[in-house]
Each structure stands twice: as structure tokens, then as C-alpha cells.
Amino acid sequence: MNLLTMSTELIYIFLFSMAFLFVARKVAIKIGLVDKPNYRKRHQGLIPLVGGISVFAGVCFAFLITNQQIPHFRLYLACAGLLVFVGALDDRFDISVKIRAFVQALVGIAMMAVAGLYLRSLGHAFGPWEMVLGPFGYVVTLFAVWAAINAFNMVDGIDGLLGGLSCVSFGAMGILLYQSGQMSLALWCFAMIATIIPYILLNLGLLGRRYKVFMGDAGSTLIGFTAIWILLQATQGNAHPINPVTALWIIAIPLMDMIAIMYRRLRKGMSPFSPDRQHIHHLIMRAGFTSRQAFVLITLAAALLAMIGVIGERLTFIPEWVMLALFLLAFLLYGYCIKRAWRVARFIKRFKRRMRRASKNKHES
């Protein structure tokens, strides 16, 4: 596939997803698939929860128009379709966490049993020897599926953030896969971005506040599952184009935020799934930034971490264990900042005041 053909297909996918969103939001309002404001959700009015359904429709359209051979795409669509359906039911009726976890385990088992996708190896992340998981890899894979889905679900807290972080992750994967000649998987990653961008435009209100939509659990579940599916295809096997440790950098911010949040909740004796306002975007907004500024800052941080992962992947002289050590160092720094969020917030507020004062003095002089 040449670049012109890929670009043309991506434009078609973008236009289809945009048109589908406008149609789907009207249907969602009629059937009650909307998000209502409450004590945790500060938006105004009823917002259609159709972002995830639109992304899934866009992916189906992408598979329909491309000539690329996507491995096990029928199984993926069946699993993803089930997750989107259950996610939409949860968006509409707020179903049990146990039911959602069971369905996530079900699609994870199908992915391993039918497609043969599971974590056989962690590569050379722990030294010069390869870390082969053997039968234990099936258990680790189920946990990875659950972790990826919930990591992306938990960052969906302010406008644009889930879409921005998703585009960073799929963009990094797409670049590495394209450079490795894996055109079908690269197209899949770029198609995900093409389906997500229309959602971002509407979610941020860039096409008018009255057209605003949310992703919903259907969308965050789909994005997390798609990310882990592609990463398993790209990091496992003898000729894998991406090292397993690079996957950590690609989804760094969602992963770090999820681990930090769950650790903090468990320490307080709370359920790890109980809602609160302690996510990274909440902490940044408490430091005096707007939700739009928090979205930009977090997305840029995710892009920086993903770029480090991409560079580490390309520079073959850097051992995988060094990349793991650097990631753990970045995670410790993240945890330190989150644990002392009030100090960080106070420092940022003081810095912003000094900058405003300096700017004011400059204008007066």
C-alpha cells in the first residue's frame, strides 16, 4: 500500500465517522442514550453518548473499504462489537461491574483461544535473557486486557482527553508499524485516529456547543481493547516489530494514572473502582489550569513519553531493560508529584503569579 492510497482511505474513514456522529447523536437523544449532569459531572444539559459507537462504525467501514489483510479482523469485530454493545447498555442503564468484567474476560479468552494472541514473552526487559511466560502468559494476558480497558476508561474525565491520549497511543503504534513494513496494522492504527478525530471536534465543541457528544463506556472500552489487541500482535512472535517494553511508553499516562488511582483507593480502604476526583486531570485543574489547558498539558506529556518509547525502539543499541528502568523512573516521578499534589499545585500557582507579574511589569515599562 502506498502513502497516497492510505491517505485517501483515511480521508474516507474520517468523513464517514463525522457523518455517522451527526446521525447517531440524534438517535441517541430519542432513545435516552445521554449523559446527565450530577455531582461529579459538571456539564450542562443532556449529552449524547455516541462517540464509542461512532468509532466502532468507523472501524467497520475501514475494514470494508481497504484491501489490506487485517489478521483475525472478523474475530476482532465480534469481540469489539460485544464490548461496545455492553458498554452502550452500561451507558444507558448502568449495569453491574461484575457483568462488564465477565464480558471483558470472555473477549480476552476468545482472543487467546481463537486468534492465539497472548503474552508469550516480555522480551529482554529484565536483562540479557528473554522473559518467557509459558502457560502463565494466559493469566497475564487477561490482566493486560482488563488493565488496558480500565486505564483508558479512567482517563475519560474531561473534554478531549480520552481522544487525545488515544490518538497519541495509536499514532506511536502506527509510526513504528509503518516503519517496520506492517502496513495492515499501521493502517488500522491510523484508521482509529481518523475515527476518533471527529469525536474530538464535537466533544470539544469546536463545531458548535449544541453538537457536543461524549465517548461513553462503549468508547473507552473499545479503545482499550483495540490498543491491547494491536500491541499483542505487534509485540509477540519471533519477528515482532515492537518490543514489549515499548508498549508501556505508548500507553504511559493512562497506565500510570490507573495504577496510582487504584493504589490510593486501596490504601484508603475503598473499592478500586469507586469514583472520585483524584485523577491527574483533576489535580492539574486544582493547580489553576482550565479543563482545556489540562487536556493540552496531559496530551503533550503523553506524546513526550510515547516519543521516548519510539526513539528507544528505533535506537537498537539501547537495551530493553534500560527502557524499563527509565519507565519505572518516570512512574516514580509521576507518583511523587501525585502524592504531593498540593505542593506541586502551590508551586505552579506561585510560578503562574510570577509570570503574570513579570508580564505586567514588562507592559508597564
From Swiss-Prot:
Q: Does the keyword Membrane apply?
A: yes
Q: Which cofactor does it need?
A: Mg(2+); Mn(2+)
| Enzyme class, broadest EC rank | transferase
- For this protein, the Enzyme Commission number is 2.7.8.33
In what pathway does it function? Bacterial outer membrane biogenesis; LPS O-antigen biosynthesis; Bacterial outer membrane biogenesis; enterobacterial common antigen biosynthesis
Q: Where are the transmembrane segments?
A: 3-23, 45-65, 99-119, 132-152, 157-177, 187-207, 213-233, 242-262, 293-313, 315-335
Tell me how this protein sits in the membrane: Multi-pass membrane protein
Please provide, alphabetically and separated by semicolons, the GO molecular function terms listed in this UniProt record. Answer: glycosyltransferase activity; magnesium ion binding; manganese ion binding; phosphotransferase activity, for other substituted phosphate groups; UDP-N-acetylglucosamine-undecaprenyl-phosphate N-acetylglucosaminephosphotransferase activity
Q: Which reaction does it catalyse?
A: di-trans,octa-cis-undecaprenyl phosphate + UDP-N-acetyl-alpha-D-glucosamine = N-acetyl-alpha-D-glucosaminyl-di-trans,octa-cis-undecaprenyl diphosphate + UMP
Q: Which InterPro entries match?
A: ECA_WecA-rel, Glycosyl_transferase_4
Arranged from A to Z, the UniProt key words for this protein are:
Cell inner membrane, Cell membrane, Glycosyltransferase, Lipopolysaccharide biosynthesis, Magnesium, Manganese, Membrane, Transferase, Transmembrane, Transmembrane helix
Q: Which Pfam families does the record match to this protein?
A: Glycos_transf_4
Tell me yes or no: is Manganese among this UniProt entry's keywords.
yes
Any one Gene Ontology biological process term? lipopolysaccharide biosynthetic process
Q: Name one GO cellular component term.
A: Gram-negative-bacterium-type cell wall
- Where is it located? Cell inner membrane
Which family does the record assign? Answer: Belongs to the glycosyltransferase 4 family. WecA subfamily.
| Free-text function comment from the UniProt entry | Catalyzes the transfer of the GlcNAc-1-phosphate moiety from UDP-GlcNAc onto the carrier lipid undecaprenyl phosphate (C55-P), yielding GlcNAc-pyrophosphoryl-undecaprenyl (GlcNAc-PP-C55).
What name has this protein been given in UniProt? Answer: Undecaprenyl-phosphate alpha-N-acetylglucosaminyl 1-phosphate transferase
